[in-house]
Amino acid sequence: TIKISDNGIGMTGEELENNLGTIAKSGSFNFKKENADNEKVDDISVIGQFGVGFYSSFMVADKVEVISKAFGENVAHKWVSTGADGYTIEECEKENAGSEITLYVKEDTENEDYSKYLEQYTIDELVKKYSDYIRYPIVMEMSHQVPDPDKEGEYITEVSEETLNSMVPLWRKNKSEIKPEEYNEFYKQKFMDYNNPMHVIHTKTEGQATFDALLYIPENPPYDFYSKEYEKGLQLYSNGVLIMDKCADLLPDY
C-alpha cells in the first residue's frame, strides 16, 4: 500500500460524497469560485479544475480508501471504492483533522509493473518531476543503509523523514535577488547539461493572462534536434505543478 496524509481542514461525510463521489465535480474549482474575492484564498496554490485528478489513483490501485476528519468536527468518515462498483462512506475514528489516503496497489501483470510505485526511488522521482514547486513540504519516510556502529562491516536500515520537494521555483523569485550562478546551476540540474546556458530570459507578465517565464538558450542544440523524433515545447506549470512537459503551443516554430 501507499499511504498519503495531510494535516489540512479535512472533509465531512457530505463533502466526501460531493467531492469524491461525483466524477467531473471539482471541489478545488468550486472553492476558488466561492472565494474569488478573498485575497488570502487567492494566494493559495489550488490547481483543481475538472474533478477527475483524484480518480487517476485507480490507474495503479484496485482499491482506494480515504479517511477524513473535518476541522471542528467530532467524528471522522471513511470513503472506500474499488473504482467500478461505486463507493461506501461510513463513520470511523481519527484523532486529528486532515485526510489520509491509502492506495492498495494492483498486482503486477505481464504488461504492467505496478510494484515499482511502491519503491521510494520511484515516488521520490515522481514528486520531483510533477510537484517539486508546490509551496507546502512533501515529506516521506526514507530508508537508507548505514554502517552498524556495533558490528564492523555490517549495515542496518535507518528510517528518517525527508522533504522531497524544493517548494520555491526559481522563476517566482525576484530577478534582482538571483545570481547568475543560481540560474546556471538550476539549468544544469533541470536539463542534465554540463555546460552553462548561452543566454537566460526571465520575465513576468501581468494582465488578463498572468505568468512567469524562465527561458534558457543552450550552448548546443539537443542531440536529436535534426531528427524526426525531436519533440519541441516548453515545460508548463500551474501553481507549481507540472502540467505539460513539452507544450508546443507556447512559442511559434521560428
Residue ranges and their predicted role:
Residues 1-117, 125:
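GHKL (Bergerat-fold) ATPase N-terminal catalytic module, capturing the glycine-rich phosphate-binding loop
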